[in-house]
């Protein structure tokens, strides 16, 4: 008698790997997105050093330094011009440097250089020495800002769903530097000869703290996010010369002239209008906070607009913000101006990186970002001296009017820029 045959239904059935539950997949995606946000925020402390601490803090230091050292507005603007000239040299050198060293290495070198030079400004009173130090600080700032932009673009391409947000988070990090400056500078100024010097030391210490986080984030991005592979149509895009995006470059250059006039002299204008130090510090804090939150505000625009339209919109809004305190001398107008300006000006910078990411292949990003940074630096060189000269002869309000007109002209140029290739 044969033993009863065992059922083989379970064994004969085809076997499949169990699919992960939908909730698990969603949680993994959420964790990946949050990790990308954290990296972008960490990296953004590099932009906090490059612009917020190393450059825009000077607007708060300008009034006490001008009074203590007997400068004219043109002389005071010359220090920002020297800083912008250094920024230009750094931007021009970046494509060559990036072929020899990784972006993370260049960012770290820029952080060290900038922190040391910020401290050096605290022991210097001679105009010539300060000019040299501010020029060298600009070189360090460019290394930080451009290499950080390359890494942010790489992170954005690895997370296309949040690409605009990630770029905005990186550039919006400048707001952290503005907020830190607006708190540190008034707290460390002392009422004596050269009483502005301790503020430079405080800013240098803030640079060191921010650098530790930014360099760590840069290393993780380089380790986890390699440059994406080139696409089929990348060969044609790689051959595109800067002449093909000349309108965007021109609009961005005029942005550099117009925005730096505002950021250099707005604090002096408010103080000349009789506003207290507390009001001015609160204004600068609000400007910085608006810069930080701007990442979310404009992320959709940066994702949708592949040509120069985003830069055009932002330049026009910046022109309006710049006109407000020149035409209406009231704290309320100043605060509205600061919030609008803060919410838009670093997104204008982010829009150029978004343009490069949309229109050039990954191996062309360093060259593209460097081209925008270079024209931006030319604008920043001209801006402080030109607006300072106008302000010396016709008043600070007239200088801001000229800044606004420059921004409107930049909006018109950027609006003429078309995308270099169609969306994939």
Model-predicted regions and their roles:
Residues 105-119, 309-323, 404:
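Structural signature of the two symmetry-related core transmembrane helices
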Residues 133-172:
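Cytoplasmic helix-loop-helix junction between adjacent transmembrane helices
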Residues 117, 128-136, 332-340:
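Paired small-residue
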Residues 359-396:
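A late C-terminal transmembrane helix in Major Facilitator Superfamily
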Residues 70, 102, 123-129, 306, ...:
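Helix-breaking motifs and short loop linkers at transmembrane-helix boundaries and internal kinks
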Residues 58-59, 244-285, 289-292:
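Extracytoplasmic gate region of multi-pass secondary transporters
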């Amino acid at each position: 008698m044969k033993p009863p045959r065992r059922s083989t239904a379970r064994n004969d059935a085809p076997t499949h790997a169990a699919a992960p539950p939908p909730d698990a997949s969603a949680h993994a995606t959420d964790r990946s997105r949050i990790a990308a946000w954290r990296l972008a925020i960490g990296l953004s402390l590099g932009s906090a050093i490059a612009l917020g601490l190393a450059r825009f803090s000077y607007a708060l230091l300008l009034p006490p330094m001008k009074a203590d050292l007997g400068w004219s507005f043109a002389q005071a603007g010359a220090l920002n011009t020297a800083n912008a000239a250094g920024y230009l040299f750094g931007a021009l050198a970046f494509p060559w440097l990036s072929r020899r060293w990784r972006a993370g290495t260049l960012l770290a070198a820029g952080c060290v250089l900038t922190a040391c030079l910020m401290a050096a400004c605290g022991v210097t009173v001679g105009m010539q020495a300060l000019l040299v130090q501010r020029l060298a600080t600009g070189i360090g700032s460019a290394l930080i800002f451009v290499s950080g932009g390359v890494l942010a673009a790489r992170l954005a391409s690895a997370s296309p769903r949040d690409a605009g947000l990630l770029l905005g988070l990186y550039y919006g990090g400048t707001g952290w530097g503005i907020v830190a400056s607006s708190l540190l500078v008034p707290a460390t100024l002392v009422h004596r000869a050269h009483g502005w010097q301790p503020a430079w030391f405080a800013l240098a210490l803030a640079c060191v703290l921010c650098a530790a986080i930014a360099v760590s984030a840069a290393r993780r991005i380089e380790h986890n996010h390699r440059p994406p592979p080139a696409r089929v149509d990348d060969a044609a895009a790689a051959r595109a010369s800067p002449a093909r995006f000349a309108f965007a470059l021109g609009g961005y250059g005029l942005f550099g002239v117009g925005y730096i006039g505002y950021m250099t002299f707005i604090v002096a204008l408010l103080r000349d209008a009789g506003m207290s130090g507390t009001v001015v510090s609160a204004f600068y804090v609000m400007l910085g906070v608006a810069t930080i939150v701007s990442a979310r505000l404009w992320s959709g625009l940066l994702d949708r607009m592949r040509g120069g339209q985003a830069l055009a919109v932002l330049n026009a809004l910046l022109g309006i913000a710049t006109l407000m305190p020149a035409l209406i001398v009231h704290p309320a107008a100043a605060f509205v101006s600061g919030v609008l300006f803060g919410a838009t000006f670093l997104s204008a910078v982010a829009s150029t990186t978004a343009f490069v990411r949309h229109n050039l292949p990954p191996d062309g990003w360093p060259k593209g970002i460097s081209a925008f940074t270079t024209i931006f630096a030319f604008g920043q060189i001209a801006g402080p001296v030109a607006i300072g000269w106008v302000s010396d002869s016709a008043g600070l309000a007239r200088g801001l009017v000229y800044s606004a007109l420059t921004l409107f002209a930049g909006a018109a140029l950027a609006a003429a820029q078309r995308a270099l290739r169609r969306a994939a």
